[in-house]
Structures are given as C-alpha cells and as structure tokens.
C-alpha cells in the first residue's frame, strides 16, 4: 500500500471530518513521516499491510535509543493508532498492528506554579513601555492573565480582540472557540502594542507580530518567556505552560469557581482543571494553620 497517498488521505480526513487544528496536523504528519522513514531504513519498504507488532516494538526501541522522551514516544504511538484505525475504517487493512501495544509508563514531572510574589516582579510598566521589549513582556502578561496555550497566543487573530467588551476569542484544541475576559490593564497595553505593530500583508490578520512583520512562532514565544522569567525566578521550568498553570492556580486560590476556570482554560473535562486545586499545598497549610481552632491554639490531641 502506497504510504504517502494514505497519509495524505488520513490528514485530509482528520482536518475535514475531525476538524483538527493546523498544529495538530503538523504533529501527526511529523510522527507518521518518522515512522515511514524507519520502515524504509529497517524493512526496506513502506507497505502498511506488512507492518506487524514486532516492527512497532522495534520502532519504540529505536526511539528510545535516540533518547526520545517517553511522552513523545507515546504521542507517536497514538498517531499511529489513529492512522491504522482510519485504514481499518476505509477497509484497507483487516487488523491493526497497534492492537494490544501498550504505551510506555512514566511519571510526569510535577508542574510547580510561580508564586504571586514572583509574578509581581514581572509586570508591565504601562507608563514607560520600551518598544523593543513591549512585545515580549506583553506575551508573558497575556499568557499569565488569560491562561491561554502557547499555540492559542500565536494564532490569536486581530479581529478576535474586542477592546470594547474587554475580551478575546481564542481557538483551542479541536478548533473549539472560547471567550476569555481581559483586564483593563492588559487591554490598555494590548492597544498600545498596536501602535508599534507593523505586519506584512500576508500576516496582518494575526494580533502578535514579530519585528519583521511576520506571525510569531512557538520558538519565539518560548524564548521570550524563558528569558524574562529567568530574571525573577530560579525555577528550572520556565515555559509558557507554567504561566498557564500559574494562572489556574492563582484564580482558584482566590475563590474562582472551578467550573468557570474549566471554561476559560478550554478543558474538555473537569478532571483536567482539578489538577490545579492541589497545586499549592503550602497555601492550604497556611489556611489551616490560621483558621482551624486547634491549629491556632496548638492543642495537643
């Protein structure tokens, strides 16, 4: 079976029928092309029908030997599962070599949110914005004040920023749109940024534009966040996702309803949001020690 043709049919299917985002399509294409190259190098063919469980396991070993993270290996397996389910659906194969192939087990590193004190050091000076640094500082504030994902920030459209209503519309996973409120302070700085924003014609629809007039990429956002947060914290993890994590943790600590936070975060299930309720155990200890009668009086049991 011709691999390239079936790959394109599959990508068209998940784009049209499943309405997967462009970023998701890029990930699927990369994962499946990696497997295609592996087949060619180790089996001297790209026949999907001839792929069996042994080849899949060899692919996993190959990725492990290249020091690919377990999370990334599992993602590639997930892409292959979806691909073969599609081939089953259209009747091109009778069974999937991924059946009974287990994902790798791993312990995810605990995400530690930034404290309010750390974030207080990283605030925009509205009265004295520096032209060169305003974009990068605005990126950080937008991520922290809205909780949006890096890809959602990069793909934010100019027309989806409503200054009159104080809200933005972002397109999340599965091309699902959601409305997120923005503070007057953030709105003011975003409006100020528009005064120095000079996009190229091809990228004028995007809100965030780099100095060359082009749409931002993920690498630029990650670099901006890492550089600026290095000035205020010694934490090892300084990624855009940590700012999203910090947003959720802080608004929940201040009493926001978890169901409302779920909507803002764009989570499909409440379980994803509940992760953030246990993020700051020290805060819970402080509440207990200051509020519980026995903790306050240090009564022996």
Language-model regions, residue ranges each:
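Conserved catalytic core of the tyrosine transesterase superfamily
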Residues: 1-301
């Amino acid at each position: 079976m011709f691999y390239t043709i079936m790959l394109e049919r599959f990508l068209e299917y998940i784009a049209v029928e499943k309405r997967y985002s462009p970023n998701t399509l890029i990930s699927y294409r990369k994962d499946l092309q990696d497997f295609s190259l592996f087949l060619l190098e180790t089996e001297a063919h790209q026949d999907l029908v001839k792929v069996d469980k042994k080849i899949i396991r060899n692919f996993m070993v190959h990725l492990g030997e290249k020091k690919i993270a377990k999370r990334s290996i599992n993602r590639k397996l997930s892409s292959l599962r979806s691909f073969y389910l599609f081939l089953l659906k259209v009747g091109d194969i009778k069974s999937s070599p991924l059946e009974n192939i287990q994902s790798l087990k791993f312990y995810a590193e605990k995400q530690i949110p930034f404290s309010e004190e750390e974030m207080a050091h990283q605030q925009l000076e509205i009265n004295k914005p520096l032209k060169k640094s305003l974009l990068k500082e605005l990126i950080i504030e937008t991520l922290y004040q809205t909780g949006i994902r890096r890809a959602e920030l990069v793909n934010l459209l100019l027309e989806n920023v409503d200054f009159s209503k104080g809200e933005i519309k972002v397109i999340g996973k599965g091309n699902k749109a959601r409305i997120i409120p923005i503070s007057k302070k953030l709105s003011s700085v975003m409006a100020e940024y528009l005064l120095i924003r000079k996009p190229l014609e091809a990228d004028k629809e995007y809100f965030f534009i780099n100095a060359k007039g082009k749409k931002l990429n993920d690498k630029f956002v990650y670099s901006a966040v890492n550089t600026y947060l290095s000035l205020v914290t010694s934490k090892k993890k300084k990624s855009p996702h940590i700012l999203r994590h910090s947003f959720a943790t802080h608004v929940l600590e201040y009493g926001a309803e978890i169901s409302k936070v779920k909507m803002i975060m764009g989570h499909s299930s409440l379980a994803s949001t509940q992760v953030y309720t246990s993020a700051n155990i020290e805060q819970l200890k402080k509440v207990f020690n200051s509020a519980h009668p026995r903790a306050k009086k240090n009564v022996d049991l």
